[in-house]
């Protein structure tokens, strides 16, 4: 599913996992679908290494389109898995 979202937070995230320290760049997204049928709760999305190089620190208060394959619980919040389809400039990746 494709979601047009507003990025409300763009931050580094660190935690200790099974294989040691894990460092990610995480954005918090609020669905802004123009149809009015929106997700009520904001969700987190972890940037891939390619996306991190391109977008880290540049998405705050911008709208992007994210292709979501699944929403999974992570630390009491929902975290999306997928890819950024179009960036804040409206161009496809």
Q: How would you describe each model-predicted region?
A:
Residues 27-32, 66-70, 87:
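Oligomerization/assembly interface segments of phage tail-like spikes and tubes
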Residues 13-18, 33, 73, 87:
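Acidic surface patches and DE-rich sequence motifs
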Residues 1-3, 23-25, 41-43, 60-64:
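A generic structural signal for short beta-strands and their flanking turns/coil linkers
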Residues 5-9, 60-71:
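OB-fold and OB-like beta-barrel modules that bind single-stranded nucleic acids
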Residues 69-93:
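OB-fold/S1-family single-stranded nucleic acid-binding modules
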Residues 1-24:
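Structural detector for short beta-strands of small beta-barrel domains
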Residues 16-46:
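OB-fold (S1/OB) nucleic-acid-binding surfaces
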Residues 47-66:
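Short nucleic-acid-contacting surface segments enriched for D/E, G, S/T with interspersed K/R
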